Amino acid sequence: NRVSFSLVICSYRRKGWLEENLKKITMDPALQKLARENGFVVRIVDNAGELADSYGPGIRVYPNENTGGSGGFSRGMEESAKEKDRYGTSHVILMDDDVKLQTESLHRLYALLSYIKPEYRQEPVAGRMFRLDYREMQYTAAEIWNGGDLRHIGFNRDMTQEENLSDMNENEGAEYGGWWFACYPMDFVEKNRPMPFFLHCDDVEYGLRHGGTPIILNGIQVWHETCEYRQSPVIAYYDTRNTLFVNEFLNDIFDYDDVLDKWKQKITEAHLKREWLKEYCLIMAL
């Protein structure tokens, strides 16, 4: 199969992280050959207006208003689709700006898609998330939505232990991959854009809308900060609001009284902890 990537990165005030990954890409001879001969392009959507105009051949920077992750990735998809014929783009990779990347992941993804069987060509590929604080620990290989009560495939596994390797590519039950690193066929991207959630759950809804089972392969991964380090009142707002939207879009059957009870529990917990801003954000989310 002929494979050509558009690597889309939505960036907001992560210049140092981003430039470290770009340096790895530009210094990788195999990736530079793909850029020259196979249409490999890196597209950075700059939501903060802080990046240089150019980082070298094959790297595009698109200044953008701060439209959040949803808007930034959507812009990157649009730019990829506009030039798909020029570059022969077959797949779009969506990657966060605050990950640690090894270019080996891109090599393996290219090899996988080059030899994949026809019946799997339209399936997405989920990149694993390894922990930044314990780098040998896989946090997740792919996700199960479960109505918002997330289940992680291969959750918190120490991948230095042999017993954790035997089923590491098992994707049974997987529904989507997070946009720390995920790859979709251009055929799907060209016709589909993320919901305008600003932050959070855009990757959930997009993957569930695709409906395929994401492929998991060892070595296709990034290191990323896990959710316990990323909590804030604003995040609580988007998580609460967007979860309700996703379930409604999917026509998932759920008990509205149960939803209300869980919401009240969150508000009560925030109130008892004197987290007034979080309490306010949770109220606004509903």
Residue ranges and their predicted role:
Residues 156-181:
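A recurrent flexible, glycine/aromatic-enriched loop bordering the glycosyltransferase active site
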Residues 233-257, 277-286:
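Catalytic core of nucleotide-sugar-dependent glycosyltransferases
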Residues 104-152:
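Conserved donor NDP-sugar-binding/catalytic core segment of glycosyltransferases
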Residues 4-9, 25, 38-44, 92-94:
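Hydrophobic targeting segments
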Residues 14-33:
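Short, well-formed alpha-helical segments that are part of the catalytic scaffolds
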Residues 86-100:
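Short beta-strand-to-loop acidic/aromatic patch adjacent to the donor-nucleotide binding site
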Residues 173-181, 190-208, 213-222, 232-235:
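Donor nucleotide-sugar recognition loop
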